């Protein structure tokens, strides 16, 4: 099992260097020594900012929902195509991205290539707005999506390669925190940027929208630089620590998918059913809060971003909590139930929506910290890239279909029916969590073990 091969943890800087990778033959400054805590923290910083630009630009349409619809003369269903076109390529390419990381490019070159796709895609997206061609904007989102989700696979694989062990949940939480910092900044800043450009141009329109989106592309350039630096540091660590000696030597095959366990397939179902109730809702949330609660556009953007605002500081804290307690399945169940309650409050009550959105932010963070690391517990290490890629792939199949469905439901039936639709998806996720718990218990698996028990299992005999 993957959880039996412990790597050095993030907080274990003083562990005996003879356990695991070979120590450097010469004395190095702590921040330059791959075995030292300071160096691994440096790597973690670049690892976290790797997805900053992608997350910042992913929700550009959500933060500019009213402006995009007005400037490009769209209905809601057409607007949601911007999210669908992001997701469609990853139904296949995200899975292949994990395969390419494992067999073709390697983690370092693959990360740089995917970062380039993100940057080029955002530039095409902005150019489409400048030229007033919505089809070109969709092309940009398509290219952006090819890089965005595959980059997330690379980020997850980097995390496991460097920090697999008892702090892996914390590292996943920190990664999510920094990525969601990008989403939060986007939600609260890009509208202001649009307003300033509108004042300078003298009017709104496609040109104003295009310039705003082109400015947003600078964050993707920043993430590309992080990918280059991270690749250099990883290559250097491989040379110093002779990491190649510790590789399994096994060659991954695409046919390995048929050997994925029932537990892994249930994790995939939870992932899809849960996230289709999060991202499409945020994509359409601005107008929802304006129409139902009478918020101004500025207030609507603020509350629509609260999920990301909360997840930024909460993710590492909740990741640390999951690390120390274990019981991943129970934490996932709690997150799904809390999210279900949040959507029910938004759908059927007029309570202050800050309550529901705050609960949604906490539960979203908790699920990410508890769900994604479970993949490393149920697949061999040499298949991690493919497993994470497949997880992202079917997630994007769900998001592509549900984004179009959500836009159509909203145009025809309104927000109440849309919320009922999201609630049904969460009920499916809850059923999958219950089945995962029962199957893991029956098979005496390790997904719901306490942290102490899991640590004992991981120690060599």
Swiss-Prot record:
GO BP annotations of the record are:
dipeptide transmembrane transport from lysosomal lumen to cytosol; protein localization to lysosome; protein stabilization
> What is the protein name given in its UniProt record?
Lysosomal dipeptide transporter MFSD1
The UniProt GO MF terms for this protein read: dipeptide uniporter activity; protein homodimerization activity
Record comment regarding domains:
The dileucine internalization motif is required for lysosomal localization.
Taxonomy, superkingdom: Eukaryota
Instruction: Indicate whether Nuclease appears among the record's keywords.
Output: no
Q: Which gene encodes it?
A: mfsd1
Q: Which CDD domains match?
A: MFS_MFSD1
Please tell me where this protein is predominantly located.
Answer: membrane
Where along the chain is composition biased (Basic and acidic residues)?
Answer: 1-13
Q: Does the keyword Oxidoreductase apply?
A: no
Q: Where is this region: Disordered?
A: 1-22
Report the subcellular localization: Lysosome membrane
Q: How does the record describe its quaternary structure?
A: Homodimer. Interacts with lysosomal protein GLMP (via lumenal domain); the interaction starts while both proteins are still in the endoplasmic reticulum and is required for stabilization of MFSD1 in lysosomes but has no direct effect on its targeting to lysosomes or transporter activity.
Q: Give the record's family classification.
A: Belongs to the major facilitator superfamily.
């Amino acid at each position: 099992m993957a959880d039996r091969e412990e790597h050095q943890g993030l907080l274990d800087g003083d562990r005996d260097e003879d356990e695991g990778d070979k120590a450097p033959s010469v004395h190095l400054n702590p921040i330059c020594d791959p075995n030292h805590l300071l160096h691994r923290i440096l790597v973690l910083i670049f690892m976290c900012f790797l997805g900053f630009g992608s997350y910042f630009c992913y929700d550009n349409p959500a933060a500019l929902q009213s402006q995009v619809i007005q400037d490009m003369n769209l209905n809601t269903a057409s607007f949601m195509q911007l999210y669908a076109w992001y997701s469609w390529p990853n139904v296949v390419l995200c899975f292949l991205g994990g395969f390419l990381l494992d067999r073709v490019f390697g983690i370092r070159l693959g990360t740089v290539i995917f970062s380039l796709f993100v940057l080029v895609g955002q530039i095409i997206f902005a150019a489409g707005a400048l030229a007033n061609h919505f089809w070109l904007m969709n092309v940009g989102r398509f290219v952006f999506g090819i890089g965005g989700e595959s980059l997330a696979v690379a980020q997850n694989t980097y995390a496991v390669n460097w920090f697999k062990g008892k702090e892996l949940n914390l590292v996943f939480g920190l990664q999510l925190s920094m990525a969601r910092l990008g989403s939060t900044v986007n939600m609260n800043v890009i509208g202001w940027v649009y307003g300033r450009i509108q004042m300078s141009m003298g009017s709104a329109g496609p040109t104003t929208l295009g310039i705003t989106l082109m400015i947003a592309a600078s964050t993707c350039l920043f993430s590309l630089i992080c990918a280059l630096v991270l690749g250099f540091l990883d290559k250097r660590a491989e040379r110093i620590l002779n990491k190649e000696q510790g590789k399994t030597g096994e060659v991954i095959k695409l046919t390995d998918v048929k050997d994925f366990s029932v537990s892994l397939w249930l994790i995939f179902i939870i992932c899809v059913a849960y996230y289709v109730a999060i991202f499409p809702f945020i994509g359409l949330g601005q107008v929802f809060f304006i129409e139902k609660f009478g918020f101004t556009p500025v207030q609507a953007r603020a509350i629509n971003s609260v999920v990301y605002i909360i997840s930024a500081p909460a993710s590492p804290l909740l990741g640390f909590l999951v690390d120390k307690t274990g019981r991943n399945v129970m934490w996932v169940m709690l997150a799904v139930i809390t999210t279900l309650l949040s959507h029910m409050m938004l759908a059927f009550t007029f309570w202050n929506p800050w309550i529901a959105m705050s609960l949604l932010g906490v539960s979203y963070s908790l699920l990410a910290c508890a769900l994604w690391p479970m993949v490393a517990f149920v697949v061999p290490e040499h298949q991690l890239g493919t497993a994470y890629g497949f997880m992202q792939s079917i997630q994007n199949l769900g998001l592509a279909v549900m984004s179009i469905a959500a836009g159509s439901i909203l145009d025809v039936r309104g927000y109440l029916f849309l919320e009922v639709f999201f609630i049904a998806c969460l009920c499916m996720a809850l059923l999958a969590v219950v089945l995962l718990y029962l199957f893991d218990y029956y098979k005496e698996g390790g997904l719901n073990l306490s942290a102490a028990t899991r640590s004992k299992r991981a120690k060599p005999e």
